[in-house]
Amino acid sequence: MANRNKPINDSSGMMTISEDGNLVVLNGQGEVLWSSNVSIGFNQSTAQLTDDGNLVLKAGPNGNLVWQSFQQPTDTYIPKMRLSSNARTGKKTLLMSWRSSSDPSVGNFSAGLNPLGIPEHFIWYNGHPFWRSGPWGGQNFIGIPEMYTSVYLQGFSVQEEADGTFTLSLIEDPVIRET
């Protein structure tokens, strides 16, 4: 939900590409409630919802990727989305809970990778550790032994990138079979 702290409660809202090339959500009065907020420099932008659920904004004659929803997660993890954390820069992507079942604004819980030491998946409550997975052991988080047997947890990978960023991603689509 792009505008979760200012949700539109009727059908008057609209998503469009603004004059400066940004993806924006407008209310019925034409006020900008949310923007992709990237510096594009010209209005040759296109938006596309990819097959894997990633909303992307492309700009310029070559269609360069300038923004993508998978780098701005809200409350739901989608396969091929990446949660990352960089201890050097402090930059991290987190999933954030809703305030309540009827209020989509940012709530008290967040989830993501801990940027310090060996990567671990954490759930924080108001910024304080609430739960942790245990360190990444190369094939699973050692605090979640059922990762090997759970169809919902198989296929995750944690990788360290050249800039020190640790990234959690689902490297294969889970296949759920009825038996």
Where do the language-model regions lie?
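Beta-rich ligand-binding surfaces for carbohydrates and other polyanions
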Residues: M1-T179
